[in-house]
Amino acid sequence: GLLGSIGNAIGAFIANKLKPK
């Protein structure tokens, strides 16, 4: 759903900030 997509995007953003490649 929409909330799932938003949550997934936020999770990916945070993960990218925590472990930048």
Swiss-Prot record:
Tissue expression remark: Expressed by the skin dorsal glands.
Alphabetic keyword roster: Amphibian defense peptide, Secreted
GO BP field: defense response; negative regulation of nitric-oxide synthase activity
Gene Ontology MF terms in the entry: nitric-oxide synthase regulator activity
Gene Ontology CC entries for this record: extracellular region
Biological role stated in the UniProt entry: Has no antimicrobial activity. Strongly inhibits the formation of NO by neuronal nitric oxide synthase at micromolar concentrations.
Descriptive protein name: Dahlein-5.2
Organism (species): Ranoidea dahlii
Taxonomic placement: Eukaryota, Metazoa, Chordata, Craniata, Vertebrata
